[in-house]
Regions:
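Feature responds to low-complexity, polar/acidic, surface-exposed segments characteristic
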Residues: 33-38, 555-573, 586-602, 609-641, ...
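A structural feature that tracks compact, well-ordered secondary-structure segments
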Residues: 196, 207-212, 222-225, 458, ...
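Sec-dependent N-terminal signal peptides of Gram-positive bacterial secreted proteins and lipoproteins
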Residues: 2-5, 9-41
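Second-shell loop/turn segments in exported
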Residues: 53-61, 140-148, 235, 315-323, ...
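Extended intrinsically disordered, low-complexity coil regions enriched in Ser, Thr, Gly, Ala
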Residues: 110-155, 162-170, 203-241, 282-310, ...
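Exposed beta-strand-loop-beta-strand "reactive/processing" segments of non-cytosolic proteins
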Residues: 75-124, 172-215, 260-292, 339-385, ...
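Short, non-transmembrane alpha-helical segments in secretory-pathway proteins
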Residues: 53-91, 145-184, 233-266, 314-352, ...
Length: 756
């Protein structure tokens, strides 16, 4: 739905964020400090998407013309250039837990040789738009510097939401956090805005609208949670307890818990471990009317008690097997994936040995269930050295539901029975890991519709919980294994607790940063599924993804969002600052940066590659990245290895020796050569005899590069100054920034959407 480039990382991040979007997109981002380990694992271990139940075309309620009419009403005059024949109707479907019928409509058209595309999803009898995506045929005006400013885009989004839901009140929230590491310059500028629906001027947690506006002013994405506003009921806002009173109540019960936090840099594959303090994890909020504590199990008059840490097994257990082959792994997978249905056929697509992002040698089995004219598949991973399961998700219940073979299942296991099953599966399929993990310290998450229990067994080191590392086990209503995921990162040395601030000091810092946000939210344990409770949600600090550093007692941010350096320059200020905001240029301190300083060849190629392509150096992506070594002095451990090897692959750098001088300054003439090669015009530039350059310093241009310089100048990439090209002058950061942006525009003119 979103154009996020070709990177596997960006796709995976989007999936994760989609699953936890309700929490992350709310203004209570720092509520994540209170989120339990259980919640984190459930959202991140890749649980399957919702099952779509297809509806026969004969049962479709709305015609194509009705859908087109509703679409045009939502976007008056915007798509008048489309004819009815440009639209196509997709299938209708519903979800098992939401019987509202959904209809899909798409459109495509070619204008001046360029194709545009879009789709829209409607839900319910009123054909409420649930999602919308539009890919225009021309995005030139959306490239930096964009035609539409952020302020103008904000007004466009606000006006659109007002028209979309005239009778409902939506509140524009603060700018959403930039989750992605960088954006290449051939991608158009996008502005994202988040709106929360309100009732009695209080935001509703699960009623949101997300809108993206392109840099040319066009609305390109919309997503909103479908609502049953006609049947929803809400707590009386006049009956809530005083906010300050509740705040003091929370502070009085607050405790600080020491945790290990692993920060993983996917680009370098480095892992840094630090000690952090986190508040009581079992508390979700406080009911605003009764003052009861909200936990995973509902409301309680008693504050949730901290669970004592208990190892699954005190001593190491032997691995399940002493290494397995690809054929062994395939047999294990077939045992897990076997499905008892004549309507479904299992197909093993591939069995490969890979190294996962935790550095483990695993065997990856890609498989597909084929049924009717559809199919559904995913990947299973098995540890090559131990034969133990690393990742498994059962799709069989979903498949059965799609083909109508499995009825609604009531929960038939008690929590205790399901936990015993989960421990049994952990001992059977990951025995060699278990001495590093503890019994669940948080309540199980229960998918009540299917009766599935999800348990999280946290990793323990030095009697301290390791945040993010866990074994996640899902147990189905019939006691079968529904999901299994082991996240275990190899860490050589764990920080000592000798120099951490005291628990009391940490608790004081948490209390100082704590605030409460009044929110309407549904409580899963409530029998009335349409009722919204008023809840005070805890918030810490103002920075999203913030944490309390246990060694300094200070607040830090995992991503340092909103704290980018800002620099000044007489003629390239906006370009340089855009490079910084797009994470193309890494500047720690704007005061020390000199935009007129010379750029080395190594730094120049790094900036060019970061501007035009997505490069990931980490182990998890190494299967898709370069493994060759072109230059003796640039081995795979060199920080510029991927950038230089990618430049060689793209013929930007054409090796003429055994080494590459990363430290020597890049001259303007050399920069012109690189740019022309980026555009694929190397052959056109090589015949220097057909080019005439009349610069005052034309004699300083090397003969073999006359064509490159002539083209770079005529295309406006590198311009003359007082009729001097200055081919042997060292290029500066400012020149590089301005000229690369021009290059990005030329690239999109040549091939819209081009990105390496």
């Amino acid at each position: 739905m979103f154009d996020l480039g070709t990177s596997k990382f960006r796709g995976n991040i989007l999936i994760i964020l989609k699953k936890i979007g309700i929490v992350l997109s709310s203004s209570a981002l720092s509520f994540g400090m209170y989120a339990s380990v259980t919640s984190a694992s459930i959202t991140e271990n890749g649980q399957p998407e919702k099952v779509q139940i297809q509806v026969a075309s004969t049962d479709t309620v709305f015609s194509k013309n009705e859908l087109i009419k509703k679409f045009r009403e939502a976007f008056p005059k915007r798509f008048d250039f489309l004819t009815d024949s440009d639209f196509q109707v997709g299938g209708s479907h519903f979800f098992p837990d939401d019987k509202q019928l959904r209809h899909d409509l798409s459109f495509t058209k070619t204008i001046n040789g360029k194709r545009l595309y879009g789709n829209v999803g409607f839900v319910g009898e009123d054909l409420e738009i649930e999602h919308f995506y539009y890919q225009p045929s021309n995005t030139a005006e959306a490239l930096f510097p964009a035609k539409t400013s952020k302020e103008q885009a904000r007004k466009i989004a606000v006006d659109f939401v007002k028209e979309l839901d005239g009778g409902k009140e939506y509140q524009l929230e603060s700018d959403p956090f930039n989750y992605f590491p960088k954006q290449i310059l051939t991608e158009p500028v996008r502005y994202s805005f988040s709106f929360a629906r309100t009732e009695n001027q209080v935001t509703i947690l699960d009623q949101r609208i997300e809108v993206s506006v392109l840099g040319n002013g066009e609305i390109i994405t919309l997503y909103r949670n479908p609502s049953n506003s006609d049947t929803s009921t809400f707590d009386d806002v006049k009956k809530i307890k005083d906010k300050n009173e509740m705040l003091e109540k929370v502070k009085g019960n607050l405790s600080a818990e020491l945790r290990y936090q692993i920060d993983y840099d996917y680009q370098t594959d480095d892992r840094q471990v630090q000690l952090v303090y986190q508040p009581t994890t079992k508390l979700r909020g406080v009911h605003a009317s009764t003052g009861k504590w909200l936990t995973a199990n509902g409301y309680s008059a008693d504050f949730p008690v901290k669970t004592k840490i208990e190892k699954i097994t005190a001593n190491p257990l032997p691995p399940k097997q002493d290494g397995i082959t690809l054929e062994d792994a395939k047999k294990i997978a077939e045992q897990f994936l076997e499905i008892n249905s004549d309507k479904v056929k299992l197909s093993i697509q591939s069995v490969d040995e890979i190294e996962n992002y935790n550095g483990q040698a695993v065997i990856s089995i890609q498989y597909m269930y084929n049924f009717a004219s559809s199919g559904h598949g995913t990947t299973m991973e098995i540890n090559k050295n131990t034969g133990e399961i690393i990742q498994y998700n059962d799709l069989k219940s979903q498949i059965a539901e799609q083909i109508g073979e499995k009825p609604y299942i009531e929960n038939t296991l008690s929590n205790r029975e399901a936990l015993a099953k989960a421990v049994k599966y952990a001992k059977e399929w990951a025995p060699s890991y278990l001495h590093n993990f503890a019994m669940p310290i948080d309540e199980a998450y229960i998918e009540e519709r299917q009766g599935i229990y999800h348990f999280t067994f946290p990793r323990i080191e030095n009697d301290i919980v390791v945040m993010g590392d866990q074994i996640s086990v899902g147990v189905a209503a019939d006691g079968s294994l529904n999901s299994f995921n082991v996240n275990y990162q190899e860490i050589e040395q764990w920080p000592s607790t000798d120099k951490v601030v005291s628990e009391e000091d940490a608790k004081s810092a948490l209390k100082k940063a704590l605030s409460l946000k009044l929110t309407y939210m549904k409580q899963e344990k409530n029998e009335d599924k349409n009722h919204y409770d008023l809840v005070y949600l805890p918030e810490f600090y103002e920075e999203p993804f913030s944490y309390l550093n246990a060694n300094t007692g200070e607040w830090n941010s995992s991503f340092q969002g909103g704290k980018l350096a800002v620099i000044s320059h007489p003629w390239a200020e906006k370009e340089l600052n855009y490079f910084i905001s797009a994470k193309v240029l890494d500047i720690k301190d704007g005061k020390d940066f000199n935009g007129d300083a010379s750029v080395s060849k190594g730094e120049a190629i790094k900036i060019i590659m970061n501007s035009l392509t997505y490069i990931y150096d980490g182990r998890y992506y190494s299967g898709n990245e370069n493994k060759n070594q072109t230059f003796d002095n640039i081995d795979p451990k060199h920080p510029l290895y991927q950038a230089i090897e990618r430049a060689v692959e793209m013929d930007i750098i054409q090796p003429d020796g055994q080494t590459f001088d990363v430290d020597s300054p890049i001259k303007r003439e050399e920069l012109a050569v690189w740019y022309i090669r980026v555009l694929g015009l190397e052959q056109a530039a090589k015949d220097s005899s057909i080019y005439k350059i009349d610069f005052a310093d034309a004699n300083k241009v090397r003969t073999e590069y006359i064509g490159h310089v002539a083209l770079a100048n005529s295309m406006g990439l590198l311009k003359t100054e007082q009729n001097h090209f200055n081919p042997d002058r060292e290029a500066t950061y400012a020149e590089l920034a301005v000229s690369i942006i021009r290059l990005a525009h030329k690239m999109t003119e040549k091939a819209p959407g081009l990105g390496y």
